[in-house]
UniProtKB/Swiss-Prot annotation:
One of its GO terms (cellular component) is cytosol. InterPro entries: BRCT_dom, BRCT_dom_sf, DisA/LigA_HHH, DNA_ligase, DNA_ligase_AS, DNA_ligase_CS, DNAligase_adenylation, DNAligase_N. Zn(2+) binds at residues 404, 407, 423, 429. Keywords: DNA damage, DNA repair, DNA replication, Ligase, Magnesium, Manganese, Metal-binding, NAD, Zinc. This is DNA ligase. NAD(+) binds at residues 34-38, 82-83, 107, 130, 170, 286, 310. It comes from Corynebacterium aurimucosum (strain ATCC 700975 / DSM 44827 / CIP 107346 / CN-1) (Corynebacterium nigricans). Disulfide bonds: none annotated. Belongs to the NAD-dependent DNA ligase family. LigA subfamily. NCBIfam families: dnlj, PRK07956.1.
Length: 674
C-alpha cells in the first residue's frame, strides 16, 4: 500500500473520530475527556499542515461544531465562531507575535455551553445553542427561566437600548450547586452528572422549562454579534454596555497592554483556577479594538483576533483505600479505586477508574498507596500512578476476583487475548440487568424518567423483573412488591403511578429508540436511526443479511455482525416478542419516512450550502435511502457543490461525474432525478 493511501486513511480515521466526539460534545454527551479530544484535534491539524492537500472545506478543522440533533433550528444573525487553542507559553507567544495590538482583553474560558440571544427593541425574541456556528437549537423557552438572562433590557444615557443586538454568552452551573444537585440525584437513585458542563447542557435541552429551573443555571456574557444603533469601539466598551443593559459579565476580565502581562495572567489563573465561581479550563485572549478585529478577520472556524490558552487537566494526590470492581450492562468487569475524598476540577471525588486488571498491574498501584489522579471531564477520574517515595511497606497487592461480585459466575475474557474480563451470565446477572434497565430508560433510548439506578436495582432484587422482557407488562399489582414504588403502608406511590404512565408513553417511542433500548452492542442512536430509516421495521431488519445491514450508511460490518449475533440468542428474541405483544413500536411511522427517492444512489456533498448544514444534508440523503459518502470515487452518482468546494469538485470533474448545485440537490431529494 502506498504512503499516500496510508496518509489518506490516517486522515479519514482522525477526521471521523473528531466529528463523532465533537457531535457528542455539543449534544451534551461527551465520551472522552476534553484533553483527549484536544489531542485528536491537534493531530489532525498537524497532519493537514504537513499535507495541505488533505484540508478541504468539509474537514473538521474548517468547521465550528456540530448541528444539534432532533430540534427546531434557528439561524444565527452572525456566525458564532469557535476558538483556536494553544497549550504552551511558546505557542501563545507565537500568536501574540503574529497578532500585535495596543491592548488585549483577557477573560476566563468558562467550561459551559454557548448561547446566542437576540433582542429586538430591547426584548428577548430568540435563544439558541451554538450548534454548528451557523444554525443552533431553539432553546428560547428554556432561556427565559434562567434568572441571569433578562427578558427586557434597561438602558442608560451612555448606553441606550439598541434596536437590535445579538448577545453571546456561556450557560454554566456553579460547582457548589452542582454538588448539591448530584447529591440529591444520588439520594433519588438517579444517575449523577459527569460535570457541571454536562448538567448545564442537558438542562438547556429539557422539554419542560419548569424542569430547567431546577437545574439552577447561570449565564455570563462574552461577546456580541449583529447589532443596530450600537457601535462600540472596543471589546471592553461592549462589555460595559452589556452590563448597563442588565447582563452579567465576568468580573475576572482584565485589559492589558503588553504580551508580558498576557503571559502573567495565564500563569496567575492556572494557579488560581478554583478562585472563580464557575468552572474554567483556560484563558481567552482577545484583541480589544473592534476595528482591528474586523481587519484581522477569521478562518472558516475561528477568529484570528482571539485565542484560547487551554490548561492541562488538574492532577492531585490522595490515599488509595481499596480497589473494588463494578459490572456493566455488557458484563464488562471494571476495577475502580476507593479513595480518601479529594477536590479536583470543580468537584469532590472518592472513586477513580482503573479500567482493567492489567492496567492495575501496569500502573503498579497498591492498596494503601498515595496515588496521583486527574479528572478531565469524566465523572470518575483516572488514576495515573503511585507516589513511590510515599510508600512505607504497609501497602498490599490487589487480586482480581475469579467470580462475578454480583452473581458469583466465573469471570473470563470474551475471546482469547482480551484485556477486559466479563461475567458471562448476561441474562440473569443482577448488575448487568440493572444497568440495561437504566440504559433503556435513558434519554438516548426510551426516556423513562421514573426508572433510575436505584429503582432498576429494586425491581430486580424484589423479584418484580427477571429480565427486561417483562418491563412493559408491569402493572400496579406487580409494583406493590417493590419498595421504591410503594408507600410505607404498602400502596402504590406517586413514582409508581408515574412509571406506569412513562411505560405507556414509551410504547409509542420512535422505532430507532427501541433499537437503542435493546442494548445491542455498538448500536447507538446514530446507527439505530440509519437502520430504522432504511429497513423500516423489525421484521425486515431481522431478515436482512450482514452485507445488507453493513451497506447502510453509518453502520458498517462490525455493527452489522453484532446486530445479527444479538438475535441468535433465544432470550433476546423473547424480549422482542414480548415487547411486540405489549404494543411497543416495531416499525417506522410511514408518515415520518420520506419517499425513498435515493435508493441505491451515492451522493457526496462538498462546500457550504445555503439551506443545509453538513449534517442536515447527510441526513436528507440517508433518510431517502441514499448513501452519503465523504469521498469522491467512480462509484459516486452525484456530487453536490456549494461555496468553497475545494478538491472534491475537481476530482468529480476529472472522473466525469454529475455535478449539482443546491437547487439540483433539492430536486434530486424530491424526485431522485437531477
Amino acid at each position: 500500500m502506498s504512503d499516500a493511501v496510508d496518509i489518506q486513511r490516517e486522515w479519514s480515521e482522525l477526521a471521523q473520530e473528531v466529528r463523532k466526539h465533537r457531535e457528542l460534545y455539543y449534544n451534551g454527551e461527551p465520551s472522552i475527556p476534553d484533553a483527549d479530544f484536544d489531542e485528536l484535534f491537534q493531530r489532525l491539524l498537524a497532519l493537514e499542515a504537513e499535507h495541505p492537500e488533505l484540508q478541504t472545506p468539509d474537514s473538521p478543522t474548517q468547521q465550528v461544531g456540530a448541528a444539534p440533533e432532533g430540534a427546531v433550528d434557528i439561524e444565527h444573525l452572525e456566525r458564532l465562531y469557535s476558538l483556536d487553542n494553544v497549550f504552551s507559553a511558546e505557542e501563545l507567544q507565537d500568536w501574540l507575535d503574529r497578532t500585535p495590538a495596543e491592548a488585549y482583553l483577557t477573560e476566563l474560558k468558562i467550561d459551559g455551553l454557548s448561547i446566542d440571544l437576540v433582542y429586538r427593541d430591547g426584548k428577548l425574541v430568540t435563544a439558541a445553542t451554538r450548534g454548528d456556528g451557523r444554525v443552533g437549537e431553539d432553546i428560547t423557552a428554556n432561556a427565559r427561566v434562567i434568572p441571569d438572562i433578562p427578558h427586557e433590557l434597561t438602558g442608560t444615557d451612555e448606553y441606550p437600548v439598541p434596536s437590535l443586538v445579538e448577545v453571546r454568552g456561556e450557560v454554566y452551573m456553579r460547582p457548589d450547586e452542582f454538588e448539591e444537585i448530584n447529591a440529591a440525584r444520588r439520594e433519588d437513585g438517579k444517575p449523577t452528572f459527569a460535570n457541571p458542563r454536562n448538567a448545564a447542557a442537558g438542562g438547556l435541552r429539557m422539554k419542560d422549562p419548569e424542569d430547567v429551573k431546577k437545574r439552577r443555571l447561570h449565564m455570563v456574557c462574552h461577546g456580541i454579534g449583529a447589532r443596530e444603533r450600537f457601535q462600540p469601539t472596543s471589546q471592553h466598551d461592549a462589555y460595559k454596555a452589556l452590563e448597563a443593559w442588565g447582563f452579567p459579565v465576568s468580573p475576572y476580565t482584565q485589559r492589558v497592554t503588553t504580551a508580558k502581562e498576557v503571559q502573567e495572567r495565564v500563569t496567575y489563573w492556572e494557579e488560581h483556577r478554583h478562585d472563580a465561581y464557575f468552572e474554567m479550563d483556560g484563558l481567552v485572549i482577545k484583541v480589544d479594538d473592534l476595528a482591528s478585529q474586523r481587519a484581522l478577520g477569521a478562518t472558516s472556524r475561528a477568529p484570528r483576533w482571539a485565542i484560547a490558552y487551554k490548561y492541562p487537566p488538574e492532577e492531585v494526590t490522595t490515599k488509595l483505600l481499596n480497589i473494588e470492581v463494578g459490572v456493566g450492562r455488557t458484563g464488562r468487569v471494571t476495577p475502580f479505586a476507593i479513595m480518601e475524598p479529594v477536590f479536583v476540577s470543580g468537584s469532590t471525588v472518592s472513586m477513580a477508574t482503573l479500567h482493567n486488571q492489567f492496567e492495575v498491574k501496569n500502573k503498579n498501584v497498591l492498596i494503601g498507596d498515595t496515588i496521583i489522579i486527574r479528572k478531565a471531564g469524566e465523572i470518575i477520574p483516572e488514576v495515573l500512578g503511585p507516589v513511590l517515595d510515599k510508600r512505607d511497606g504497609s501497602e498490599t497487592e490487589w487480586v482480581f476476583p475469579e467470580n462475578c461480585p454480583a452473581c458469583g459466575t466465573k469471570l473470563a475474557p470474551q475471546k482469547e487475548g482480551d484485556q477486559d474480563w466479563r461475567c458471562p451470565n448476561t441474562r440473569s446477572c443482577p448488575a448487568q440487568l440493572a444497568a440495561r434497565l437504566e440504559y433503556l430508560a435513558s434519554r438516548k433510548a426510551l426516556d423513562i424518567g421514573e426508572l433510575g439506578e436505584k429503582a432498576a436495582a429494586d425491581l430486580i432484587s424484589s423479584g418484580v423483573l427477571e429480565d427486561e422482557a417483562d418491563l412493559f407488562d408491569l402493572d400496579e399489582q406487580a409494583l406493590l412488591k417493590s419498595s421504591v414504588y410503594t408507600t410505607q403502608k404498602g400502596a402504590l406511590n406517586a413514582s409508581g403511578k408515574k412509571l406506569l404512565e412513562n411505560l405507556k408513553t414509551a410504547r409509542q417511542a420512535e422505532f430507532w429508540r427501541v433499537l437503542v433500548a435493546l442494548s445491542i452492542r455498538h448500536v447507538g442512536p446514530i446507527a439505530a436511526r440509519a437502520l430504522a430509516t432504511r429497513f423500516g421495521s423489525m421484521e425486515v431488519l431481522r431478515a436482512a443479511s450482514v452485507e445488507e445491514l453493513a451497506d447502510t450508511d453509518g453502520v458498517g460490518t462490525i455493527i452489522a455482525e453484532s446486530f445479527k449475533q444479538w438475535f441468535e440468542v433465544d432470550w433476546h428474541d423473547n424480549i422482542v416478542q414480548k415487547w411486540t405483544a405489549a404494543g411497543v413500536t416495531m416499525e417506522e411511522e410511514s408518515s415520518d419516512k420520506p419517499a425513498q427517492t435515493l435508493e441505491g444512489i451515492t451522493v457526496v456533498v462538498t462546500g457550504t450550502l445555503e439551506n443545509f448544514t453538513r449534517d442536515s444534508a447527510k441526513e436528507a440523503i440517508i433518510t431517502r435511502g441514499g448513501k452519503a459518502s465523504s469521498s469522491v470515487s467512480k462509484k459516486t452518482n452525484y456530487v453536490v457543490v456549494g461555496e468553497n468546494a475545494g478538491s472534491k469538485e475537481q476530482k468529480a470533474r476529472d472522473l466525469g461525474l454529475t455535478i449539482l448545485d443546491e437547487e439540483g440537490f433539492t430536486r434530486l431529494l424530491e424526485t431522485g432525478e437531477a
